[in-house]
């Protein structure tokens, strides 16, 4: 088994920050901390098993190679791409968001 490193894009980092702030304000510190723990656990799992996510059809997003994986206890999905030696985290988004090519476009991450 190849263990890969996690390489979060700045948008993924901002997503996590925004979600933690939202949960802290809405439901309290304990819920926000539980979200942070779940993100850490999800990243650890993706490091060891990067293929656990589901491919997002190219017709849907017009971007090849993007996978998504839903968190267990929170209604968010991690969007990522497997590289040779690492997993690129693109975004962490609520499924009610309009997840389009513009949301995940590679040009946004350049």
Predicted regions and their residues:
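Residue-level signal for pocket-adjacent positions within structured domains
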Residues: 1, 54, 94
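Arg/Lys-rich, positively charged N-terminal/basic patches that mediate binding to nucleic acids
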Residues: 1-38
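Amphipathic, soluble alpha-helical interaction motifs
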Residues: 18, 22, 45, 49-52
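Short, hydrophobic secondary-structure boundary micro-motifs
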Residues: 32, 54-58, 101
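Compact soluble domain cores
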Residues: 40-42
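Basic/aromatic recognition patch in beta-strand/loop cores that engages polyanionic ligands
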Residues: 48-86
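Enriched for short, Lys/Arg-rich terminal
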Residues: 71-110
């Amino acid at each position: 088994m190849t263990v890969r490193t996690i390489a979060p894009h700045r948008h993924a980092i901002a997503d996590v920050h925004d979600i933690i702030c939202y949960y802290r304000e809405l439901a309290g510190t304990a819920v926000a901390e539980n979200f942070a723990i779940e993100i850490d656990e999800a990243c650890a799992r993706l490091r060891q098993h990067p293929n656990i996510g589901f491919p997002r059809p190219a017709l849907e997003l017009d971007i090849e190679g993007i996978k998504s994986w839903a968190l267990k206890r929170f209604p968010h999905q991690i969007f990522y791409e497997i590289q040779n030696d690492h997993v690129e985290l693109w975004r962490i988004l609520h499924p009610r968001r309009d997840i389009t090519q513009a949301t995940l476009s590679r040009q946004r991450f350049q």
